[in-house]
From Swiss-Prot:
This is NADH-ubiquinone oxidoreductase chain 4L. One of its GO terms (cellular component) is mitochondrial inner membrane. Its EC number is 7.1.1.2. Core subunit of respiratory chain NADH dehydrogenase (Complex I) which is composed of 45 different subunits. Coiled coil: none annotated. Gene3D superfamilies: 1.10.287.3510.
Length: 98
């Protein structure tokens, strides 16, 4: 396994651990999710280029589109929560209340 793939795999696992560790703030969780999506994008791009898959060359672009949609939905949720409650603590949110 090349060194760049090992580094990207470590970046993915570090960002995934960041989601688990920093789950008290919504902004920190969103940043860690963006890190995972970025490392997944780079890994799929490198694997597509190295293995010469012509049919799956659109897979990184599709992943990037899903990452942009995830970021937009996350930011909309962050703005809504911070306008409603005044802070972005996930622990203070209760989904049972309407």
């Amino acid at each position: 396994m090349p060194l760049i793939s090992i580094n990207l795999s470590l970046a993915f696992t570090t960002a995934l651990l960041g989601v688990l560790m920093f789950r008290s703030h919504l902004m920190s969780s969103l940043l860690c999710l963006e890190g995972t999506m970025l490392s997944m994008f780079i890994l799929t791009t490198l694997s597509t280029l190295n293995l010469h898959y012509n049919l799956s060359s659109t897979l990184p672009i599709i992943l990037l589109v899903f990452a942009a949609c995830e970021a937009a939905a996350g930011l909309a949720l962050l703005v809504t929560v911070s306008n409603t409650y005044g802070l972005d603590y996930v622990q203070n949110l209760n989904l049972l209340q309407c």
